Amino acid sequence: MTVLDKNYLRLQFWNRIYQKSGTEFQSFFEDIMKKAFPDFQPIKPYGNKGDRGNDGYRPDNGIYYQVYSPENPSEKETEAAKKLKADFGKLKSSWDKISKIKEYYFVFNDKGQGVSIEIESALADLK
């Protein structure tokens, strides 16, 4: 693959990320993860119980993912930080006994804008 090919594919990838929000982005993320990691299991919400803070995980490795992709990420940074903490609490109380949490990833589609200090601070609080 040439450098030009790689740059074209990178541009296509960023274009897709930029265009997707909400469940459409989550489905895109799941498709990538299933191709990259055969053991990845997406979790669908169950009635009023939801997904209990887990949008997908790799059970053998204890690696969990929570996905959040608002339409306007810069307007939702405070909400994202609160969601990150709340969802990790749900994850810890519901999923840790199923597969011990070893790694946690909050997948925030910032649409290339960069992550705010609020989200970084919320992640630091979990450590």
Task: Give the residues covered by each predicted segment.
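Globular "head" domains of long coiled-coil molecular machines
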Residues: I43-D55
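Active-site beta-strand-loop-beta-strand hairpin of nuclease catalytic cores
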Residues: Y57-Y64
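Acidic metal-coordinating catalytic centers involved in nucleic-acid phosphodiester chemistry
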Residues: G89-K127
